[in-house]
Structures are given as structure tokens and as C-alpha cells.
């Protein structure tokens, strides 16, 4: 193993000089002995003259010129397999839950090629989430990729936690959760939520939170993905949750600037599309097993045309768009049924009835959207009888799209509901057909099935 020495430290970027005949490869891991602390660096560029430019995977506090650096001669490797289940690890796969060693049998490098074209498999099976608006409007495919788009504070993490709770309990497979640049408090809440739901022994948790250096946040998504790939290659159907994919892009922007690359649009790194592609192309299903991924995507300033969310859109099968306008009406989950889409919403995949009900719901809501201006200026009385009926049904549909969540029980005080797809379709079909025109609209707010709405109406 070749050794070199640090010649420059600028924040998270460290330049290391090696002998000319032993220069480490790009993406190799280097180890710095800094007193009791061991710091891992990852080679990003070879500058010539035996000098390599690296990104630190931990804090560079206390580093100084002249410190000895060892080339480990392989990329960062992390534990994979069943030993990782129920544990919290950092970007290097080291345990951070005070429960001793992982005790893994195998370690894999975090940089791996994506599966080859002939190994890929696609699936038409639907994944039932138990959340009405998602199952109806933007159904998820098993082995597909789903993005949860939303600005600050509209409920991405709560939706993500509800999905994990519902799918992990209903679906008996393994899950991997990568917390990329999110709040440590949320990571803590999430751990206890999994523990209380008795699904912790089926989830591997990898955290690189907001307080970590950019190198750490940039690589932690790959660490989680590598663990998911191992489960997939064993022939399992695995779930990969990433919260938040935007922070992965942001960490890439920070690293890119530190490495001296010229920024592109809005200050993002010039390699934005490539970095996103490298990650997303590995999140895929093969003939041996599948990875179904759910990714939260922060939308800066609620602008979906920002380069980061816009680049992410291209890779997804289903997009769930969370809207601030809907959240302000108190309707949670604040999913925008007119903006959310799924490739699976096709009569050949979901069946004709599901397709017709979903499109019918969207057309009623769209018509209501158009009538809002008239109502604001002239009032409801100026509408035709037909339009009054559309508005009344649209408002019921809008409220029926809300649902109490299990993970939000402590805030709402009402028990969570898991609604089967069959009940969801039946409920919305009934509202559209006018079976519930006699019920007041508040009966449809925060209930599970349509029967609950009927019961609630009796109490009003």
C-alpha cells in the first residue's frame, strides 16, 4: 500500500502527494491517521506530478500539511447482507447506533457498474400503498421509481414515513433507507417509528445528515444503494427509500465548486445530469430481483423547472407532486391530483375501471378549477345546475382524497387508515355517480373508506 502526505487542505478538499509510480486511481479510498481519528478521503482528480485531489468523508478539522496518508487501493467498501438489517450506519458503513460491530460476512465497493441491458426486467405488478390518492391517481409499479416532489414543509418526509410503514408492514421484504442531508431529528423519529412498528429488523438505515461535510452527503446515497443491490442480487424484492435526493445534488454542487469546476445553470455542477444518471441507472430491477425506490425531492422555491427536480423527473415512473395550495386547505396528504402522474395509469395495466375512475376524478377537479374564477367574481348562484353539481362533487372528491396517517396519529389524534385499492375505486366511483350527493362535504374529510364518510355524516 502506497503512502503519501497532505500538501494542502481547503475545507473538505485535501491534496495529497504520492510517489510518481504509485499514484492512486480516481475513486480510491485513502486513509489519514490523525491522532485517534481515522479520516477517509476519496480521490476525485489526478493533478499530475503525483498529486491527487480528494474529498474528505468526515470533518477535516485538525488536518495539517505533512500528515501521512495511506492508499487503500480500492474504493470505499461497505457491509452488505442481512447483518446490516436493524442497524444505523454512516457513509463508510460504520455503525452509529452504539450496538457494536455490524459483523458482516461481505463488503462491497460503493462504485459499481449499472446492470447490463440484457439483465434488466420490467414489471407490470402494482404496489398497493393504502394511500387513496396515490393508489388512484399515480399507482406505483413493483420495481419502479417514484418521486415525491414538494417545497419546504408540505409533507414529503411524513408521506415517505407512511409509505415505509404501510409497505414494510404489508410487504414482507427488506427495505433500505438512505437519509441524505436531512435533519438528524427526522432520522431519530424514523428509527423509533420503525422500532415501534416492529419492522426495524427488516430495514437497513444509512444516514449522512445535514451537519456532515459535502463528500459524505454525496456518497451516502451510493452506500444505501449498494446495500439494496446486494439484497436484489440475492433474488429479493427490496425497497429503497431516499430522503432527500435534492441534497445529493446539492452536495454534488458543493463538491464541484470546491474542486474548481465552472458552475452551470443556477450554480449547479456542470455534471448534474451525469451524476444523477450514475445513481438512477443503478436503481433498477433485474431478472434476479427488484428494487422499488421512493425518493423525496425537495423543490427549491416551489419551482418544478429548477434544474435539479427537472433532471430527476426524467428518471421516474411515477411522480407524486405535493402542493402548497392543497396543504393550505388542510387537505393531507397534500398531493396534487392534476399534477401527479404515473406510467402505470394505463387501462392495459390497471384495468379499464380504475383508469376511467381516475380520469373521471381528474376531469371533475379540472372543471372545478376552471369554474373557480367565475365563482370568485359572480358567486355560486350564477352557475348552471349542471356546474353546481360538478362543484359539489369536486369539493367532496377533494376532501375524500385526504386521509389520516398512522405516522401522524400523534399530531391529528385520529387513528391511521389503510384503504385497499378496491375500496378506493368504489368510493370515488360512488361520488362521481352521484350516490352520495345528499351527504354534506365535511363528512368526506379525513376518513378512510366511503362507509366511514356515511357514518360520519350521521353524526354531523
Curated annotation (Swiss-Prot):
Entry annotated with the keyword Ion transport: yes
Gene Ontology molecular-function annotations: ATP binding; ATP hydrolysis activity; proton-transporting ATP synthase activity, rotational mechanism
Chief place of localization: membrane
Entry keyword set: ATP synthesis, ATP-binding, Cell inner membrane, Cell membrane, CF(1), Hydrogen ion transport, Ion transport, Membrane, Nucleotide-binding, Translocase, Transport
CDD domains the record matches: ATP-synt_F1_beta_C, ATP-synt_F1_beta_N, F1-ATPase_beta_CD
Ligand binding (ATP): 150-157
Signal sequence region: none
Topology versus the membrane: Peripheral membrane protein
A Gene Ontology cellular-component term: plasma membrane
Role this protein plays: Produces ATP from ADP in the presence of a proton gradient across the membrane. The catalytic sites are hosted primarily by the beta subunits.
Similarity section: Belongs to the ATPase alpha/beta chains family.
Description of how the protein assembles with itself and partners: F-type ATPases have 2 components, CF(1) - the catalytic core - and CF(0) - the membrane proton channel. CF(1) has five subunits: alpha(3), beta(3), gamma(1), delta(1), epsilon(1). CF(0) has three main subunits: a(1), b(2) and c(9-12). The alpha and beta chains form an alternating ring which encloses part of the gamma chain. CF(1) is attached to CF(0) by a central stalk formed by the gamma and epsilon chains, while a peripheral stalk is formed by the delta and b chains.
Annotated protein name in UniProt: ATP synthase subunit beta
Organism: Serratia proteamaculans (strain 568)
Amino acid at each position: 500500500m502506497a503512502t503519501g502526505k497532505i500538501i494542502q487542505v481547503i475545507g473538505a478538499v485535501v491534496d495529497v502527494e504520492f510517489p510518481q509510480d504509485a499514484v492512486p486511481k480516481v475513486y480510491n479510498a485513502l486513509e489519514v491517521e490523525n491522532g485517534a481519528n481515522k479520516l477517509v478521503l476519496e480521490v476525485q482528480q489526478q493533478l499530475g506530478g503525483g498529486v491527487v485531489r480528494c474529498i474528505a468523508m468526515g470533518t477535516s478539522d485538525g488536518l495539517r500539511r505533512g500528515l501521512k496518508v495511506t492508499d487503500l487501493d480500492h474504493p470505499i467498501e461497505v457491509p452488505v447482507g442481512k447483518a446490516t438489517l436493524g442497524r444505523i450506519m454512516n457513509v463508510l458503513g460504520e455503525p452509529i447506533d452504539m450496538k457494536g460491530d455490524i459483523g458482516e460476512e461481505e463488503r462491497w465497493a460503493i462504485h459499481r457498474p449499472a446492470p447490463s441491458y440484457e439483465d434488466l426486467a420490467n414489471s407490470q405488478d402494482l404496489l398497493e400503498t393504502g394511500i387513496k390518492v396515490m393508489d388512484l391517481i399515480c399507482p406505483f409499479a413493483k420495481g419502479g421509481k417514484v418521486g415525491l416532489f414538494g417545497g419546504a414543509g408540505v409533507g414529503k418526509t411524513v408521506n415517505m414515513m407512511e409509505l415505509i410503514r404501510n409497505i414494510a408492514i404489508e410487504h414482507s421484504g427488506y427495505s433500505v433507507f438512505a437519509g441524505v442531508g436531512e435533519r438528524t431529528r427526522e432520522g431519530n423519529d424514523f428509527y423509533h417509528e420503525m422500532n415501534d412498528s416492529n419492522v426495524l429488523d427488516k430495514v437497513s438505515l444509512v444516514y449522512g445528515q445535514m451537519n456532515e461535510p459535502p463528500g459524505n452527503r454525496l456518497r451516502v446515497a451510493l452506500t444505501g444503494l449498494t446495500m439494496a443491490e446486494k439484497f436484489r442480487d440475492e433474488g429479493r424484492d427490496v425497497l429503497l427509500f431516499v430522503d432527500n435526493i435534492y441534497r445529493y445534488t446539492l452536495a454534488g454542487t458543493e463538491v464541484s465548486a470546491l474542486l474548481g469546476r465552472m458552475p452551470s445553470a443556477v450554480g449547479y455542477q456542470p455534471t448534474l445530469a451525469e451524476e444523477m444518471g450514475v445513481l438512477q441507472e443503478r436503481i433498477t430491477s433485474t431478472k434476479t430481483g427488484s428494487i422499488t425506490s421512493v425518493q423525496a425531492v425537495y423543490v427549491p422555491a416551489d419551482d418544478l423547472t429548477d434544474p435539479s427536480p427537472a433532471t430527476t423527473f426524467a428518471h421516474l415512473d411515477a411522480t407524486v407532486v405535493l402542493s402548497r395550495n392543497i396543504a393550505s386547505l388542510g387537505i393531507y396528504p397534500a398531493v396534487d391530483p392534476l399534477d401527479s402522474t404515473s406510467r402505470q395509469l394505463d387501462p392495459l395495466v390497471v384495468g379499464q375501471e380504475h383508469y376511467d375512475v381516475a380520469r373521471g376524478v381528474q376531469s371533475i377537479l379540472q372543471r372545478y378549477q376552471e369554474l373557480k374564477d367565475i365563482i370568485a367574481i359572480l358567486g355560486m348562484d350564477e352557475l348552471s345546475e349542471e356546474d353546481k353539481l360538478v362543484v359539489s362533487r369536486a369539493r367532496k372528491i377533494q376532501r375524500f382524497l385526504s386521509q389520516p396517517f398512522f405516522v401522524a396519529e400523534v399530531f391529528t389524534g385520529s387513528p391511521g387508515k389503510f384503504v385497499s385499492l378496491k375500496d378506493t375505486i368504489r368510493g370515488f366511483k360512488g361520488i362521481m355517480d352521484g350516490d352520495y350527493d345528499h351527504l354534506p362535504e365535511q363528512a368526506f374529510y379525513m376518513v378512510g373508506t366511503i362507509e366511514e364518510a356515511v357514518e360520519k355524516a350521521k353524526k354531523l
